[in-house]
């Protein structure tokens, strides 16, 4: 495509039109463009060879330092190298993950308090924050929300944002955590005292479903132990009768075995289970300790990076 020079020569062309009479009035932009002409000249000037000048087109045919050892057939690069492909930012169009400090504190709390997830929670919500809007996090205990791990998270954020003396996330988290511990201990003491008072006044508490299942299972186990002990006595008697010496009538009284086969078998199984459980427990404890330490280190590093940002 030919380079357009009309925009560059617009002042000279307008002045020639004014002198010739084609334009009767001077354009409004004429003085401004004449005072501040375009700096870039788009007119293509023919190249004049000389000894001082150097043709820049010859640089295209010169080998670079990294290509000097290549053969002459590799003068032109037709595709990108591995180094050039490795420098490409392929994740530039991906949606970045949203990271919040509340999520880091929440993960850290539930990692250190796994049994907090076993408490019942209300999962029916409209927008998710209608309860938090009503809460005043200047104190831990709230009227519209039960005490749980989310209370620790919100209380930590409130202390970090409103307390000028606290500048570290871990310090604010420790303050909120100890407040949470005090309230939990107070709740447990109140429940124990209320139960003791009700028992003192004659209240009778029904057994839980777990207790009822265990008692029913134990009844069936006791009945089966009686039947198994009787069968073992019969087997011992038949064995002693078959092993009676020649000439005997086989009617000698045989003392019943004090320990049945079932009880011996149960003891052996119990000992084996204890041994296996100890080994397994030691392995699991070692593995969980390594995983928790690694996870805690990762979370602490993430929180430090977030604070630095």
Swiss-Prot record:
It holds the Pfam family MRP-S25. Its main location: mitochondrion. It is found in: Mitochondrion. One of its GO terms (cellular component) is mitochondrial small ribosomal subunit. GO terms for molecular function: structural constituent of ribosome. The keyword Ribosomal protein applies. InterPro entries: Ribosomal_mS23_fun (IPR016939). The keyword Mitochondrion applies. Keywords: Mitochondrion, Ribonucleoprotein, Ribosomal protein. It comes from the Eukaryota. Component of the mitochondrial small ribosomal subunit. Belongs to the mitochondrion-specific ribosomal protein mS23 family. This is Small ribosomal subunit protein mS23. It comes from Lodderomyces elongisporus (strain ATCC 11503 / CBS 2605 / JCM 1781 / NBRC 1676 / NRRL YB-4239).
């Amino acid at each position: 495509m030919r380079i357009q020079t009309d925009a560059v020569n617009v002042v000279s062309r307008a002045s020639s039109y004014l002198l010739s009479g084609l334009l009767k009035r001077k354009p409004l932009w004429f003085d401004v463009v004449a005072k501040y002409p375009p700096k870039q000249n788009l007119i293509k000037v023919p190249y004049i060879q000389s000894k001082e000048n150097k043709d820049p087109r010859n640089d295209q045919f010169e080998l670079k330092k990294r290509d000097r050892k290549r053969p002459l057939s590799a003068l032109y690069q037709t595709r990108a190298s591995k180094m050039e492909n490795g420098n490409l930012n392929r994740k530039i169009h991906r949606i970045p993950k949203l990271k919040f400090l509340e999520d880091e504190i929440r993960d850290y709390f539930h990692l250190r308090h796994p049994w907090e997830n076993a408490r019942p929670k209300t999962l029916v919500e409209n927008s998710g924050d209608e309860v938090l809007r009503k809460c005043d996090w200047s104190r831990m205990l709230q009227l519209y929300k039960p005490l749980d791990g989310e209370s620790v998270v919100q209380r930590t954020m409130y202390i970090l944002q409103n307390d000028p003396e606290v500048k570290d996330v871990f310090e604010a988290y420790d303050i909120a955590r100890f407040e949470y511990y005090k309230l939990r201990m107070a709740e447990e003491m109140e429940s124990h005292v209320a139960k003791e008072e009700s028992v003192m006044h004659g209240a009778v508490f029904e057994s839980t479903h777990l207790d009822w299942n265990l008692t029913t299972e134990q009844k069936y186990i006791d009945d089966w132990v009686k039947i198994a002990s009787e069968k073992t006595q019969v087997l011992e008697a038949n064995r002693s009768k078959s092993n009676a010496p020649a000439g005997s009538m086989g009617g000698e009284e045989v003392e019943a075995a004090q320990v049945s086969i079932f009880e011996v078998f149960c003891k052996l199984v119990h000992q084996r289970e204890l041994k296996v459980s100890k080994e397994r427990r030691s392995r699991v404890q070692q593995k969980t300790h390594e995983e928790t330490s690694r996870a805690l280190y990762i979370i602490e590093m993430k929180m430090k990076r977030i604070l630095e940002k």
